[in-house]
Amino acid sequence: MDEFLVWKDWWTQKYRFEIGEGVRYFSMKTALNIFHQRKGLNIVETGTIRALNDAAGGGNSTVLFGDYAQVYDKKFWTVDILPEAIALSKTVTEGYNKNTTFVTSDSLIFLKDFKEPIDLLYLDS
């Protein structure tokens, strides 16, 4: 599925206007393009989504990574110290989180103990 590498792919059509065409969109698309080209497997996000419908303010990286991971059969971990944030994350990503692992933990402890190689690390905690 190398159509992700072009600018009119499914991800761009779905998220370009939802998260805005500013720096946030282009930096996220660039990071995922590099991950995709290098045939990455594991994405780890520290700090999960904490508000509904906050694409403009928060960027919704949890949603973006979860959707990407499901489409391309990658592994995605989202880590947050707050149980209520993890609960919200599970709700918001319902329908495209089969490749997502939700972890309630301090991110420093999680990263120290994580045994898999991390191909894309998104620090948002």
Residue ranges and their predicted role:
Residues 1-125:
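A short alpha-helical cap/connector motif
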